[in-house]
Amino acid sequence: MNLLRITIGLACSYFVFAILLNSVGTVILQAINSFDITKTQASVLEGYKDLSIAVFSFAVASFIPRVGYKFAMLVALGAVTLICLVVPSIAQFYVFKLLFAVIGCSFAIMKISVYSVIGQVTNDANKHSALLNTIEGIFMVGVLSGYWVFSSFIGSGNNSGASWLNVYYLLAGLVGIAFISVLFSPIQSPQKETLPSSQWRAFLDMLALAYKPLVLIFIISAFLYVLIEQGVGTWLPTFNNQVLKLPVDVSIQLASIFAGALAIGRLVAGQLLRFIGWYSLLIGCLIAMAGLVLLVLPLTHNIDGSQVKSVFDVPFAAYMLPLIGFFMAPLYPLLNSVMLSALAAHQQAAMTGLIVVFSALGGTTGSILTGFIFDRFSGQHAFYLTLVPICLLLASVTLFKKMTLDVSVKQVKQ
């Protein structure tokens, strides 16, 4: 019963953060329409979210166990509830910068706490993996739900007014429900004797880990992956609206296919890995991603979907582009798994901190770079740009494979 109550608290929290974190693409589109700003200006919202996650993860990772996971989660949820209530009453672009900064800082707290609590309440690897996959599965449900929640408040026109901001009252209510579920969850604080003797030492160990060649090439690979994912995911609603000329609500709903493709891709990859090696799967996925970009983007020229009324009427090319998420899906979890497995157990917490930080930096870079190219050239040019990090990933993943083999050989000899 206690495990169920804890799982509900963690799942509710991850669900609402999935909606908020992945709303940045929708908010960018609406900010362009509602506040008459450029795509380059709007793209900074991704930076406010991801850089907040990166900086705050560095700042609080070793401090959270000392104040308690439950207290930390309640603070994060309380802060997000308050900012969601503030947004509709101000209705200015700068408040969205504050919104995503608060969301980013709060998610840094939440992710560290949730992963730590899962380790507390499970006593073997299989149970840990099962609970973690359940929570991450709920996260993907939240991502999918978010597109439809926002589109229902926006309507079928371009809606340059501010009435769509009322969605944040609903979101504040959902975050409030998560707050209550965590409040009544029997989440325990870690034992004092298990905490590191020095927060500064833990921080220095994390920095020292980044100097290892294997870790460095992994960081580059993770950075490139998130650059692609956030560049595509964040700007897909705007691409649908301004390149394919689809209505705003349909543009946002159609972007949910990308999230669905990511979820399905990870489930399928889990089964395929029973039969093929991780390296072969990743190389195949990268080649398929590049092929899909080269095949689909030429089909998006001269499309006028302004008369489309629902997602069932959109042009074929509009369905195809989000499917890049299916091939993209296995990359990130597989890279993380291989990297963590190559390290000693006592180094994995520090490695997790580095993953969070450089993933956030990659997301910011991808969104800003895509927005800049989109603004100066076109949406097609911006999405063709993904071919560059895809090619770089082919090289970095190959090098990563070779280095993990070298590490395995050394461990066997020792």
Regions from the language model: what does each represent?
Residues 55-94:
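Conserved MFS/SLC helix-loop-helix module at the cytosolic interface between two early adjacent transmembrane helices
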Residues 36, 68, 89-94, 245, ...:
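Helix-breaking motifs and short loop linkers at transmembrane-helix boundaries and internal kinks
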Residues 78-91, 288-310:
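C-terminal ends and interior cores of transmembrane alpha-helices
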